[in-house]
């Protein structure tokens, strides 16, 4: 059975993006970037909501091209070797985009679904392949969590209080106990928290 892994940057006060969707509060960390570039190889499918898909396509679609002038994913600046590794992987992955408003998706290996059907996600999980990963996509994260479909939560908590923004789990109405798999502090002050669903059930 394939797993669904959720990865998100998070402020210390629980926001995964600023009020206008910005991520300029993210505290970059070289060690964390190397880990992300290594771990991306364990996944072959990305699940996206519309806004995250559009943000990712705008940057990552061209980030493997050394001649590209696209800005960095969080701040303008020269891309690292790790960014290139992640870009190559993302461009080859299957990308499933959930949106009621998009008419088409043009990124390589992307397909559009207008509704998140838990039965279809279960079918995807039962198929052969590597793990599936969710970046950003607060609404999709909430829906998958509600249906008990996320197997691992990976949160990189940044040392910043934003005061306002978009909470990651604002649409989750059921309690979910988690088991801590790993807690790792990085030199930047970022802290990686990895959790699995306790017993695989929600209540």
Language model region names:
Residues 1-149, 159-203:
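Portal/gating segments that form or line small-molecule/metal binding sites
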């Amino acid at each position: 059975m394939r797993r669904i892994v959720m990865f998100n940057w998070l402020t210390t006060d629980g926001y995964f993006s600023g009020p206008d969707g910005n991520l300029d509060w993210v505290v970059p960390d070289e060690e964390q970037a190397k880990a992300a570039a290594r771990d991306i190889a364990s996944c072959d499918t990305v699940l996206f909501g519309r806004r995250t898909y559009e943000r990712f396509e705008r940057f990552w679609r061209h980030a493997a091209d050394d001649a590209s002038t696209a800005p960095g994913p969080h701040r303008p600046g020269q891309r690292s070797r790790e960014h290139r590794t992640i870009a190559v992987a993302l461009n080859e992955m299957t990308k499933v985009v959930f949106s009621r408003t998009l008419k088409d998706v043009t990124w390589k290996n992307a397909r559009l679904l207008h509704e998140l059907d838990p039965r279809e996600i279960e079918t995807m999980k039962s198929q052969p392949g590597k793990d599936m990963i969710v970046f950003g996509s607060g609404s999709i994260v909430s829906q998958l969590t509600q249906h008990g479909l996320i197997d691992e939560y990976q949160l990189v908590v940044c040392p910043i209080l934003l005061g306002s923004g978009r909470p990651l789990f604002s649409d989750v109405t059921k309690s979910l106990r988690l088991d801590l798999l790993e807690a790792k502090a990085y030199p930047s002050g970022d802290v990686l928290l990895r959790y699995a669903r306790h017993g695989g059930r929600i209540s």
